[in-house]
Every structure is written in structure tokens, then in C-alpha cells.
Amino acid sequence: MAGPGWTLLLLLLLLLLLGSMAGYGPQKKLNLSHKGIGEPCRRHEECQSNCCTINSLAPHTLCTPKTIFLQCLPWRKPNGYRCSHDSECQSSCCVRNNSPQELCTPQSVFLQCVPWRKPNGDFCSSHQECHSQCCIQLREYSPFRCIPRTGILAQCLPL
């Protein structure tokens, strides 16, 4: 008669034998990727992270890490770079500046894209055009200009 220890050992050996024969379902291909983060690549499979994306302004792809949600995200432009759409920017904010070009700009504290506004001294036609939100006519026949807010309550008053 075999003791409980021998019975348990025989059961474990039987399970190991059955497991190796069954192969635990379909066999997966071994990941033969060898490239680390930052190395040039052509396909996702070449990278240890399984993530090969455009990672700069240069038209080449590099192995990049996945996000915490296991997604491969393409490189996006930092603030100050020219853009034509919000999706091109890290901040998701592509805003027109004083020339006809648009630039990636940071989001506000409230995660909004703040449009470019004219600096003090520039000509304007409405308060919304000015960084100070203050567009007034300094003299009766002078053009409207952006001016800084003044006074204790920072009101839009002529200087």
C-alpha cells in the first residue's frame, strides 16, 4: 500500500505528463524581437515592446514603449512646433499665432486650448483679440489698441 505522500507524487507526475502532451492549447510563436526602446525598426514585431512608431520630425520609425493602457501611440509635436491639426500636438492644442501659421501650445489649467491673442500695443477691433482682454481707443480719433488692464480691480480703462 502506498502512503498519501506517494499518491500525491504520482498524481503530480501524471498531471505534468498530461500537461506536456496536451501543450496547454495552441502553441504561441516565440517572440524573437531583439530591439530595445529607441532603436530603428520597420515593424512592431522587431521591438521588445512590440511597438514601432514614428518618434520624431525625421521620417523614420523607432521602437517606443507602450502606454499604461498597452497602446502604441505615434510621436506628437511638443509645444512651439508648427502644426495644422490638434492631433499633431502632445498638448492636443494647435493654435494660430500672429502670422498665418499655427503652433502647438500648452493647454490651460482647465485643459482647454487657449487661442493666441495680440500683445499690448497691437491694433485690435474687440476685447477678445487682446491678451489683456482690453481693446480701447486712447483718443477720440486714434485706432483701437490692446492695452494692459489698470487699477485695483484690473479694469479696462484708458491710461
Swiss-Prot record:
Q: Does the keyword Signal apply?
A: yes
| Signal peptide (from-to) | 1-22
A Pfam family annotated for this UniProt entry: Colipase-like
> Which residues carry attached sugars according to the database record?
N31
InterPro entries per record: Colipase (IPR001981)
Q: Which terms in the GO cellular component ontology are assigned?
A: extracellular region
Which GO biological process entries does UniProt record here?
A: digestion; lipid catabolic process
Q: Which Gene3D superfamilies match?
A: 4.10.40.50
GO terms (molecular function) for this protein are:
enzyme activator activity
Tell me which UniProt keywords the record has, alphabetically.
Glycoprotein, Signal
Protein name in the entry: Leucine-rich colipase-like protein 1
